[in-house]
Amino acid sequence: MDLKSKFMEVYYKLKSELLNDPAFEFTDDSRQWVEQMLDYNVPGGKLNRGLSVIDSYQILKGGKELTEEEIFLTSALGWCIEWLQAYFLVLDDIMDNSVTRRGQPCWFRVPKVGLIAANDGILLRNHIPRILKKHFKGKSYYVDLLDLFNEVEFQTASGQMIDLITTIEGEKDLSKYSIPLHHRIVQYKTAYYSFYLPVACALVMAGENLDNHVDVKNILIEMGTYFQVQDDYLDCFGHPDVIGKIGTDIEDFKCSWLVVKALEIVTDEQKKLLFEHYGKADEASVKKVKELYKTLDLEGVFADYESTSYQKLNKSIEAHPKKEVQAVLKSFLAKIYKRQK
């Protein structure tokens, strides 16, 4: 059985445990609601974050075959990250008034769900400590795991806040957009939970103290930033069929890497055009912004950024004293370098 199928098996086991949690007396209706909500929101993505906990742990263990227990526990931690992601996305979609997610309507758009989705988000968040309690309570690193998830959740919610208050309607001001602001949003909103958390889970399970791995955290945050810049680029220049969504960063007045880069190199004339059309939902405005991006050769600017970042990350990774840790970081970098989706 391949790793992904094994990973899915663990999902069904965890789901079944949550639907029979002794702390709450379920009715048939409530059990059915939670089950549908979980199936709709948790396992639908690429599962990269979750699977990389298993990968990373195996590499840290020198690549030797994992025991059944190790596979189960690393999978359970991987699913905790997927639960965290589901919780963020369900609430995020309500805040952004989004239409689709992973090729289906956002959960709150499903008939009968509506704003019940807000409570479903809270439930998803509360499932994480239930899973951790059931499977890790006896472990020496139990408190470290709770701490780690709490801290990363706080960082992500704070990153989301910066993102939201930066794009408040009626306060649209492009001049406040800069590389430092872009990096701050990305670091907190995406990099901690998508890049640092999976590796941190593997390190904790392997008996490592996270305080000794600040350098690893910094490299992963840089990698997360690089990943988000790719995302910003693909939002505009990627093919919707390939990336699985239609990009709306321009319409949404997002603090995208592209607009920040554009602001650094525009003439006064071009700047006026950008200020006038960025953040407008009409097709003509979006087209004008995209044409400006082409004129400024942001595709070339991105290609330069991509190769420079790649070299810089590789150099940082190779400076790490532990070969296993290097291998974990290199496998992460290989997965995202020059990705198309």
UniProtKB/Swiss-Prot annotation:
Cofactor note (record): Binds 2 Mg(2+) ions per subunit.
Q: Which residues bind isopentenyl diphosphate?
A: K46, R49, Q85, R102
What's a GO biological-process term for it?
Answer: farnesyl diphosphate biosynthetic process
- Cellular component GO terms held in the UniProt record: cytoplasm; nucleus
According to UniProt, the reaction catalysed is: isopentenyl diphosphate + dimethylallyl diphosphate = (2E)-geranyl diphosphate + diphosphate; isopentenyl diphosphate + (2E)-geranyl diphosphate = (2E,6E)-farnesyl diphosphate + diphosphate
Tell me if Nucleus is a UniProt keyword of this record: yes
Q: Which SUPFAM superfamilies match?
A: Terpenoid synthases (SSF48576)
Which residues participate in Mg(2+) 1 binding?
D92, D96
Where is it expressed, tissue-wise?
Mainly expressed in trichomes, roots and flowers, and, to a lower extent, in leaves and stems.
Q: What is its EC number?
A: 2.5.1.10, 2.5.1.1
Q: Which InterPro entries does this chain map to?
A: FPS1-like, Isoprenoid_synthase_dom_sf, Polyprenyl_synt, Polyprenyl_synt_CS
- Specify the protein name: Farnesyl pyrophosphate synthase 2
